[in-house]
Amino acid sequence: MAKYYGGCDAGSTYTKCVILDETGKIVANITKRSRINPVLSAKDSLDEAVALVDGLNSADELDYLIGTGYGRNKVPFADENISEISCHAMGVHIAAPDVKAIIDIGGQDVKGIAIDTDGTVLNFSMNDKCAAGTGRFFESMARAFEMSLDEFSKLSLAAKNVIPITAQCAVFAESEVISLVGEGKPMEEIAAGIELSVAKRCFANDSTSDVWYPFRMRS
C-alpha cells in the first residue's frame, strides 16, 4: 500500500498544504486564503489536497503530517508541529544546499534566517511590529493600484527608473503612493520604489548579514 506524507503551513494570510509520496515526489499541493479560524483553514486546505490523491480519503490516512506556520498547533491530525523558521531552513537545505540565508516575507512579519551546513538554524531575526514590508503591505499597495497581487508583482519589471517611497509606515506609504499616482507618475516606477523600500527594510532588520551570499527570497 502506498505511503503518503503531508505538510500544512497554516499562515496568517494563506494556508498551504503539500502531499508527498514515499519517493519524495509532490503529488498534491494547495494554497488558499486563510480564514479567521485556523482550524477551518487547515482542514479546508488538507481536504482539497487529499482529494487530489487517488486512494486517500482523509488527512488522517496520511502516514505522517507536520503542521507549521502561525496556526500550526491547530492543524487537525498533525503528528508533529514545527516552527516555520526550522521548516524554511531544512526545506531550503534540501532543495538548494548552497543557500545559507533566507528572507521570508510573510503575511504579518518578515524573517531573516541563517542556515548551517546541516540545515539547522544558526540565527534568525523577525520584524513583527510594523506592517510595512510584509505581505499585507504588498496587498494594500496592489489594492491602491487597483490590480491583483500577481499583476502588481510584475509591474516593476517594466520600470526604467525608481521613484523612492520615503514613508516608513504602511499607512503613510499608501497615502504617498496614492499621491504619486494622482500626480501622474509612472505606475511601474512607483511599484519599483515600493519593492525597493521593502528590500531595504529586510536587509536593515536582518541578523544574517555575514551570510548574505548566496540567498533566496521567498514570498
Show which residues each predicted segment covers:
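Gly/Thr-rich phosphate-binding beta-strand-loop-beta motif of the actin/hexokinase/Hsp70
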Residues: 1-23, 100-119
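Short glycine-rich, Thr/Ser-proximal phosphate-binding strand/loop in the N-terminal lobe
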Residues: 4-44, 48, 124, 128-129
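Short acidic, glycine/serine/threonine-rich loops at helix termini
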Residues: 18-20, 74-79, 112-118, 124-126, ...
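Short beta-strand-loop/turn "lid" adjacent to the catalytic site in phosphate-handling enzymes
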Residues: 30-34, 53-86, 113-114, 122
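Glycine-rich phosphate-binding loop plus the immediately following alpha-helix
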Residues: 37-38, 117-161
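Phosphate/pyrophosphate-binding loops at sites that engage ATP/ADP/AMP, CoA/4′-phosphopantetheine
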Residues: 46-63, 202-213
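Glycine-rich phosphate-binding loops at beta-strand->alpha-helix junctions
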Residues: 70, 211-219
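Adenine-nucleotide phosphate-binding core of ATP-dependent small-molecule kinases
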Residues: 175-207
